[in-house]
Amino acid sequence: MDYITDASYLNNSLLVAGNYSDSPPWPVTPVMTSKWLMDKLNSFGYNSIDTAFFHLQYQDVNNPIIKDKWNDGVGIINYRGWGDANGWHKPYFHKEEITELNPNWKLPIVFSFVCNTGDFGNDLSGDGLDKCFGEELTTGGSINNPKGAAAMIGPSDLDTDTRFNNVLCAVMWDELLEGRIPELAPALHAGKQSLIKEFGDLEVNGTNIVEFYHHVYGVLGDPSLPVWLGEPREMTVNLNKNQSLTSSHISTFVTDETPLMDVVAVLMLNNAVSYTHLTLPTNREV
């Protein structure tokens, strides 16, 4: 395995969206939701937020930005729009485009809020795709030369709807960016739970929306994976090297230019964990 020495790519993001439908009128909220997320990421401190949007005023189906920025390295990729088990239709990025990516250890986490892109059972009937878009993302390349994504979120059903996907997307990102939930699957679960508040017992064509979305949306990859929102910063520990180890306690401060909260400090004695503690919420002392 190769180890990444330059993690600055985690400061970069890519937002892809398509306002499209096979019958008019075209929806407008996929791009609107993505612009909202762009503002959130900008406020959070992302260095680069590239976009590839398809809409009525800009109908460029084959947008090279997707492949170029993916190859350059981005931490997260978010999609809202129109697609199926093959991939994203507008702008166009299918399974075949994944195989054309450069091998790269700078693998993003992909959030694909669009129909069927996570359909891992597409070939269950015997005549579907052997791998859906999400499976191709998470198994692309080889062990030594991977390409695609570290993990992806997507639905396994073809009949998701824009208004529900938007809510799921927005709440997930609120939980991640506001620091309440750092892991992938728990953040997705929070998005699913938000549908209860927004839509209650709503049924569409006899289908309970909340139950449906809880059932079809999932993670392909490690569900406990923390979503790194930017390059990890270097922590500084101010420790008195001459401090007597006969004392009943040892005090130190942990900072990264500003004091850090909830840092786990571990005291080792004879190669064994002797004591652990979190930095205090008041002055970040442990």
Predicted regions and their residues:
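Cysteine-dependent hydrolase recognition
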Residues: 1-275
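Conserved small/polar residues in nucleotide/adenosyl-binding loops
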Residues: 276-282
